[in-house]
Amino acid sequence: MALELLLAMPLVAEVRSLTILHTNDLHARVTALDDGRGGFAALAAVIRKQRAQCSDCVLLNAGDLVQGSPISTVFHGLPVFEIANLFGFDAATLGNHDFDYGWIEARKFIDTANYPIVSGNLVGAGGRLFTPKPYVILRVNGLRVAVIGAMTEELRTLSTPKLMEEWHAVSVIEAARKYAAALHDRTDLVVLLGHINEVEEDRFLSQATEIPVLVTGHIHGGLEHEVSRNGRVLVRVRGYGEELGRLELAVDTEKKAPVSWTWKRLPVDGREIEPAGDVAVQVNRWEDEVSKQVDQPVAVSLRHFESSEIKRLIEQAMRDETGADFAFINQGGVRDVLPKGQLLVRHIWNIMPFDNRVVFGKFKGRDLPPVVLGDQKVDPEREYTLAVSDFTAANQSADEQLRSSGLRFSGDGGLLRDVLVDWFRKKKVIE
């Protein structure tokens, strides 16, 4: 009887410390950016320095580990996961770009990772989960910390349908709240590790009172300061490995929530910290595999180009190289900036890492949406050729005007990044 009474009694409330180190949207940027920031070897060094300073650390990644560098493009992402195993992640979730090579490759990523990859709302037929588990329970500093993975509900519109097949994301907040409720008596804290958009972030902060900590990715710009609401906190750092987040929590085990926290964004710069040698060896090994293919000069840029300007350059290249009257690419398809100076094939691949192909459609002027026309005037009855990527043609999700227009495309104008390389080589100078 005494034992039964003891087991029935609530545990004495304690406040214990927990430090969450976190990354998101690394996008295969294994080498440093042109300004010296980032790079997997420097990021690993920052992570290891931080872990050496605390005994209550966990390391999380909020998705989109691949897609964004030649190593990822050529080898379909697998080497990136192999290198990332050296970071020492305790848990991760998948991002939409982790499916850019198809769901079968994404499964290989899960098998390759030496840490659990979780998602609670990524499902197929009959609701079966894509990942082995929807969550993982980490034990650190006497705390039982549940980490629930989550994918943005926009997944289908952000991916090529044929690469996803049956897999899709169901309501992110309903799935996460379901698992949080089931975990309530088994854990001291629930953390959402989500690759979600800003609307979904806001919905969690407003509605999901049972999930007090959110570590997110998908929006590359990161946050200047943590977002807090009613005792809950959300954090997200800049992508491409430019920053490591450090969230220090004081967790009340009875309330199952933090009573205080501090958050820091730690810069990653190989000029200020000695890069991790073992990671550098692996990065260099794979870089040597692709260097001959991508470290070839294509043109000279007389100034720095931002992504909005590059969108216009890409559309011009598509028109010039294919003879189309109009071209359109969604802004989200531009993945990098162009620096001033010598441009290499690598730079072109970085702005367009996808295996997207150019396709065409012939349409009357009256059927072309304003997003394609801009300020150009057309004859409503004349037929015009419009070039787009096959990604845009497949779901036309990049723009509401295209989606509502119902335009249909066909043909094959080649890989878009090859079209761009040819165009830059012919231009020689970009200004």
Report the location of each language-model feature.
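Extreme N-terminus of proteins, especially the signal/transit-peptide cleavage junction
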Residues: 11-16, 290, 294
